[in-house]
Amino acid sequence: MELTIWKVPTSKQNPAGVRYRLAFVRRGESAPAVLYDNHHPKGHHRHIEGVEEPYAFVDVDGLLQDFVEHVRKITGDAAWPRR
């Protein structure tokens, strides 16, 4: 798993002032099963089981909640992540 969130200056490309890449990769696989990112020029989007779709970014808290929700769905583990 990789969770990277950068605070960046607000700009036309990045009005929220945030860049991010959140990835969950299953053991023994190389491609992420869940990936949220907002690289240029695509902007906010996510990949769930290899299917890319737009993502409606609101704030970092919502981003983290949505990411955890998708990982829980694909792993079937309602307690993920364990502390």
Label each residue range with its predicted role.
Residues 1-45:
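The feature represents the first ordered module of a protein
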Residues 14, 18, 30, 49-51, ...:
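Generic detection of intrinsically disordered/low-complexity segments and helix-coil linkers/edges
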Residues 43-48, 53:
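Beta-strand-rich cores of mature extracytoplasmic or soluble domains
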Residues 51-82:
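Short, compact, well-ordered microdomains
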